[in-house]
């Protein structure tokens, strides 16, 4: 007998409120055929590769920290195109349109030769090598060694009109019922998102964690990151950003391999399960009495990675990149007339060794006690951009989206909403500065707040470095050739009459 039964599955209904749709910039931005070239000066920095060298009182930094394993976060300032002296003022109507810049291409130039720089720690928490052991040995109260290694090889850059967002693991707050019982226990972890600032450290093979908080012994990582937070760009959140301002596009190349295999010194926090937790003989069989293996060794294994070969065949820098289609809704429009370029590159990681004598006179014999060794690291950058002039119509639906995205843009365009005055009649005193009248009202002028003032960037001002002569610059010539804007000279054909030869008579 056939019976009809109702469907037992769940029925999914669409949401009742309308979902706000964010328009792509291509839907309301009109691009012109006017392109500008912008190029920075040669940007140089010199410092110590591991830490800041401070004065004796510790209040003043005498030599800054400049490492090849740091991020370089450039904040490039461009002129306001609405206040720009255009060659053709009929390009737009200021009563119905506003001008913005669009990034059409860029090139990140890097100077200095390729090189591998090592890092390390004079008291590195390395009990011993665990790859090739000849005997089973236990640890002592202090097994730290002077160890160095080369970091993971990283080449990366992120381009957007707001700072790049990074992610790292940090200590999480402890629940209230467990706050009094945390001594000797591993703290809870949480993933945090922060802005990648200039000078933040790159992950060099030990993970993107806050070493300042999570490395109590100050010996688990190298000197350059032991008191720092290693960050990694949060590509997932930037790719899913509703406006797509943080990352128009990015390029990334990372490589590493495990070169050495070590084990940490100290007690194991999470011991190998044994009979004390009802897991006897499930992970290992105990050794006989009297054997060295009777006391189980440390199981906190870790590798020191290596970036391996550094070659000019795999360079992301000193070559142009053209932006045709961004990954988000913002297709290269530079809101706020600024562009953020976040760079990480440790393929030019050579550290200079500089030696000086501590004696004033002439030195005739070598004595290491009279010689001081210094470390310095240098970096060289140059940024070049191709900027396209674009127009935005002052329509209600366009202004509504821009106001929801960033109301400061409309204020910069002098399109702020003026509130209705509460009282049309005000009191105006003559001789307001005299002693016969009341004190003048102190009206504090409200300055425009910089939303990124609390962050550290390498500021690059290009407000006076724009040019229409693209063919006068290397990146401009590449752009002209790539986009087919080059005017080819016409070939002039001339007809030349060749006199006919005289026929010879046969004899």
From Swiss-Prot:
Compositional bias of kind Polar residues: 132-147
Keyword list (alphabetical) reads: Capsid protein, Disulfide bond, Host nucleus, Host-virus interaction, Late protein, T=7 icosahedral capsid protein, Viral attachment to host cell, Viral penetration into host cytoplasm, Virion, Virus endocytosis by host, Virus entry into host cell
Subcellular location as annotated? Virion; Host nucleus
Q: What is its main location?
A: virion
The biological processes this protein is annotated with in GO are: endocytosis involved in viral entry into host cell; virion attachment to host cell
Q: Which domain of life is it from?
A: Viruses
A GO molecular function annotation here is:
structural molecule activity
Cross-referenced InterPro entries = Capsid_L1_Papillomavir, Capsid_L1_sf_Papillomavir, dsDNA_vir_gr_I_capsid
Asked if the record carries the keyword Transferase, the reply is: no
Which parts of this chain are annotated as the region Disordered? 120-147
Q: Which GO terms describe its cellular component?
A: host cell nucleus; T=7 icosahedral viral capsid
Q: Which HAMAP family match?
A: PPV_L1
Quaternary arrangement and interactors, per the entry?
Self-assembles into homopentamers. The capsid has an icosahedral symmetry and consists of 72 capsomers, with each capsomer being a pentamer of L1. Interacts with the minor capsid protein L2; this interaction is necessary for viral genome encapsidation. Interacts with protein E2; this interaction enhances E2-dependent replication and transcription activation.
Q: Which family does it belong to?
A: Belongs to the papillomaviridae L1 protein family.
UniProt function note = Forms an icosahedral capsid with a T=7 symmetry and a 50 nm diameter. The capsid is composed of 72 pentamers linked to each other by disulfide bonds and associated with L2 proteins. Binds to heparan sulfate proteoglycans on cell surface of basal layer keratinocytes to provide initial virion attachment. This binding mediates a conformational change in the virus capsid that facilitates efficient infection. The virion enters the host cell via endocytosis. During virus trafficking, L1 protein dissociates from the viral DNA and the genomic DNA is released to the host nucleus.
Q: What is this protein called?
A: Major capsid protein L1
């Amino acid at each position: 007998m056939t019976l009809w039964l109702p469907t037992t599955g769940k029925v999914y209904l669409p949401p009742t409120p309308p979902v706000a749709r964010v328009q792509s910039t291509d839907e309301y931005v009109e691009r012109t055929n006017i392109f500008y070239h912008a190029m920075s000066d040669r940007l140089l920095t010199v410092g110590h590769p591991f830490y800041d060298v401070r004065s004796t009182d510790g209040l003043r930094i005498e030599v800054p920290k400049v490492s090849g394993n740091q991020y370089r976060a450039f904040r490039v300032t461009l002129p306001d195109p609405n206040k720009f002296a255009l060659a053709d003022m009929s390009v737009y109507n200021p009563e119905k349109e506003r001008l913005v810049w669009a990034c059409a291409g860029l090139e990140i130039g890097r100077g200095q030769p390729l090189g591998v720089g090592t890092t390390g720690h004079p008291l590195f928490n390395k009990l011993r090598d665990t790859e090739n052991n000849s005997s089973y040995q236990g640890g002592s109260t202090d097994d730290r060694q002077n160890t160095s290694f080369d970091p993971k090889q990283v080449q990366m850059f992120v381009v957007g009109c707001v700072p790049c967002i990074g992610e790292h693991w940090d200590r999480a707050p402890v629940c209230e019922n467990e706050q009094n019982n945390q001594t000797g226990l591993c703290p809870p972890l949480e993933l945090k998102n922060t802005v990648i600032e200039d000078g933040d450290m790159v992950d060099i093979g030990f993970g993107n964690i806050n070493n300042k908080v999570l490395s109590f012994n100050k010996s688990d990582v190298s000197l350059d990151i032991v008191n720092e937070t290693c960050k990694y760009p949060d590509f997932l959140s930037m790719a899913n950003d509703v406006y797509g301002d943080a990352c128009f596009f990015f390029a990334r190349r990372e490589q590493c391999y495990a070169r050495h295999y070590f084990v940490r010194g100290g007690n194991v926090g999470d011991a190998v399960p044994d009979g004390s937790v009802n897991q006897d003989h499930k992970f290992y069989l105990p050794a006989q009495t009297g054997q060295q293996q009777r006391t189980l060794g440390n199981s906190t294994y870790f590798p020191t990675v290596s970036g391996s070969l550094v070659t000019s065949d795999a360079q992301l820098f000193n070559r142009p990149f053209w932006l045709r289609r961004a990954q988000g809704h913002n297709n290269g429009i530079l809101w706020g007339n600024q562009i953020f370029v976040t760079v990480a590159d440790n393929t030019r990681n050579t550290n200079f060794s500089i030696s000086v004598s501590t004696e004033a006179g002439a030195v005739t014999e070598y004595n290491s006690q009279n010689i001081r060794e210094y470390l310095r690291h240098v970096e060289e950058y140059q940024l070049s951009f191709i900027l396209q002039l674009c127009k935005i119509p002052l329509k209600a639906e366009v202004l509504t989206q821009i106001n929801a995205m960033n109301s400061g843009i409309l204020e910069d365009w002098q399109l702020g909403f003026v509130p209705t005055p509460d009282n049309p009649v005000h009191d105006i005193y003559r001789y307001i500065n005299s002693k016969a009248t009341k004190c003048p009202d102190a009206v504090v002028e409200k300055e425009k707040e910089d939303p990124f003032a609390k962050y550290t960037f390498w500021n690059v001002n290009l407000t006076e470095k724009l040019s229409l002569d693209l063919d006068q610059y290397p990146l401009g010539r590449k752009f002209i050739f790539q986009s087919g804007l080059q005017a080819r000279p016409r070939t002039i054909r001339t007809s030349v009459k060749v006199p006919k030869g005289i026929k010879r008579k046969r004899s």
